[in-house]
């Protein structure tokens, strides 16, 4: 981007007009269209640099600063044109006249083969001879007071139009004194404190003088500084209150046969696309306009009553980047208060609120639109409208591409539209001819009885015109050649970079001098290239990259964008990669791509990892032996684009083979039939994952024998009849961690490779829970195209998209699948399905514990086991616990258990994953004695039947809590690398507190896709955490009761259904985060039924009674009594019935005395009732 100081300077320099006769070899340097503020999102796209310069028919721009600087070339020159007084020449609406001959300034125009007479094509100076001569003559008569020509020829004296505040060029003038100039309203506000002391209203004579300006002079845009305004407050007025319409903008003066150049920034179809003009003047205009819009509308507020009209040019805030841009109103929806606008400097359009639209200030230069609407001339769509296939194909060829078009006709529509003749740079063919050849269009006037079909032979003839061919000009020409290797080739090389023995890069030593020359050329080229902040290469592009370790330039390929300002690049001549800032990249030229890519991707032949994966130690051994050393490289096979090679170090005697060294060190074992395997896979150079038929893959599960006893950890659980375990033998988990790391590295380096999912096929699958890749089996292909996969090392089933799958390499299948499906033997559900209570209890018994499993039976569906918890003082068999608590039934034999065990009943309890974590039924809070009254603070209100509070008095268990915190810290730190944990609402868990990063016991209040809201159960704090900061809590850490208490509002409450929201609102206002007095009335299942009282100005308020008085709840005591009365059989022999009647009478009397103590008629009625 243009630096701010250059941008400001550019407004003060005189831009020389283009020469229409002289052919330029290069266009002016490309600058972006925005100000240097960080605004990367434009209404459309950046203006791209052209391939060739402007050779003819470029356009000339008129600028205010040209006149001013031209007048400064000779201080003795006085302008004869009064239009220069305010630094601007132009025409008012509907009354534009050309300036006098000899004036070096013209309206904005696009040049053609015959330039206008008033414009000099080769100005030798900035002041014409005619003007100089006239000025000299005027000065000869300067002292002749009686000379009438003095007043007839001279305009107002030329004033300095530099900003009084900052000294930059400024065309805005104080409308009160009309003497002081400013560059912006911001500068005038800052200067008002000093200027207000000398600012006086302009004299009447000056007003008359300004009223007598020539008709072709555009009125200066002035800034009014009212005397009665406080310091720093100014108001901007326009020269007339009328709206700015499209016709008010300065004209481009396009003509037929004129050639224009620019970038296609918006493409709808061949009859409607926009080209953003390219020239240094347009860039300056856009930069100036961007700065002015930002300053003028920075703190603008919507105008009351302003309603844009169709055809009005206004300023609209673009939704994507929230920047202000000029736009033309195409439609207005008054009811919805929305406007449909088209951004005239870019070509795109959108529907935005009217509040985001403001009138265009007349204080801004009325530059012509930078984007012109175009249509392809000489062709019309075959079927009446352009097909989707046509739009897609042509858009791929033109969109964001620099092009040169010839204006064939100018159509007068709502906005200016040019019918253009466009030549495709990729093939040299005219676009209208290509559309006809491909069957998408016909010549005007041609009759076609049937719709033409796409001519496939034409597609072959214009092969360079297909979607893929758009890369010919800007991408294929910028991709270095690839060295080809054949089986049997042998050369002296250097191992440049090693990932693993199955992924490393070699260089041919014979090309070393060419590579050194290339590095010199790169350094020389990049040293002279001006850094471009608008260079945004696409993924796959080759460019020059400055390596971070030595600051030297190398050829690199863009692999991915790490952020908006950084990319991951791979150095194509060495094989290594790193993340670089965009500032360390620059475009590459074809000359630097003559040398083929020197990094050859290789695989070491004859070996495979002894542990199933290549360990860091194995990689180190190989690096010590061959990296950056001259070795003999022998190609024994091809694996797609990678070479299967043998590396031999002949500098020592005897010769050392890299494969044999790895085998001897114990990190690798010999792989048989390597050469046959490599030769059989030598096909076209396509990625291995999609070439030819899929390779037959083999995999195994963890193996067991009946009556074998092993240590296990439950990693996934659906029910006691289906859960998944990790068997802790032979360092299985350590090997799995290493495998997962290698798998993640492999998948991160490989782009999506078109993996075709097949049910039962192993693959690499992306788990969104933690953003890592894991081994999986395809379980189901859904109608939507998504795939359900079973993560074989953990047991969970997830739905993923096709781009979240990758082919898996055979070496990743050597380690047996670790997530073994299991079920508890000797038990069965009471009914057909496992109950939630049984599942929750089983969950509480196994969470986070290392258990002992005895294998009872083995079937194709998994392993039937007996689980025993040895962490307790005596062995605890899990199935016996469930039977003893009457949650499950004991079955007679393993076969019976198998028959009654539901298979894959995921829907029995939950369609989501059920993690092994204690639910709300398993954890306990401290219990208070009945009838005890305590002061407490209410922490969270779930409902009137459940809220959490913490006593105000300090707990006596502080020492135990400190010990528990230390144990939790040790436990949670040891759980790193475990699968992502998703708790449920009400579960107990371990949570990592933000302020100190320590782990504490917590209760889950709410959950979302990425966050969880927790209540710290021993301290009362509440915060929202990412899922990465919560872990399941083992049952052993729940033995100490939570220091908070679970409460429910005292029993006699019945909420009206329609008032539940009001009840919750009242409870939150009355109790939440406030000190209250709790009186324990009863305890049921660790929930305290309490009455809540709160101190107020009028004394203690009972919350429950307050709800009853507000009509949001009712007392159930009387209702229950009346209900129980109805249930008691009427018996004359029972005294309880009579006693109940007497009680009810006395209750009525007491209620009467309380409510109606002075009502005599009612008093007599109550006496009769008492006597009856």
From Swiss-Prot:
Residues 307-367, 536-595, 756-815, 982-1040 form the Tudor domain. It is found in: Cytoplasm. One of its GO terms (molecular function) is zinc ion binding. Disruption phenotype: Male sterility because of postnatal spermatogenic defects due to demethylation and subsequent derepression of transposable elements. Piwi-associated small RNA profiles are altered, piRNPs accepting the entry of abundant cellular transcripts into the piRNA pathway and accumulating piRNAs with a profile that is drastically different from wild-type. Piwi proteins are delocalized from the nucleus to the cytoplasm. A zinc finger (MYND-type) spans 163-199. Residues 1-59, 72-136 are annotated as: Disordered. Zn(2+) 1 binds at residues 163, 166, 183, 187. It comes from the Eukaryota. Residues 75-86, 103-117 have a biased composition (Low complexity). Keywords: Cytoplasm, Developmental protein, Differentiation, Meiosis, Metal-binding, Repeat, RNA-mediated gene silencing, Spermatogenesis, Zinc, Zinc-finger. One of its GO terms (cellular component) is chromatoid body. It holds the Pfam family TUDOR. One of its GO terms (biological process) is spermatogenesis. Zn(2+) 2 binds at residues 174, 177, 195, 199. InterPro entries: SNase_OB-fold_sf, Tudor, Tudor_domain_containing, Tudor_TDRD1_rpt1, Tudor_TDRD1_rpt2, Tudor_TDRD1_rpt3, Znf_MYND. Its main location: cytoplasm. Belongs to the TDRD1 family. Found in a mRNP complex, at least composed of TDRD1, TDRD6, TDRD7 and DDX4. Interacts with MAEL. Interacts with PIWIL1, PIWIL2 and PIWIL4 (when methylated on arginine residues). Interacts with TDRD12. Tudor domains 2 and 3 have higher affinity for arginine-methylated peptides, tudor domain 1 is a poor binder due to an impaired aromatic cage. Plays a central role during spermatogenesis by participating in the repression transposable elements and preventing their mobilization, which is essential for the germline integrity. Acts via the piRNA metabolic process, which mediates the repression of transposable elements during meiosis by forming complexes composed of piRNAs and Piwi proteins and governs the methylation and subsequent repression of transposons. Required for the localization of Piwi proteins to the meiotic nuage. This is Tudor domain-containing protein 1.
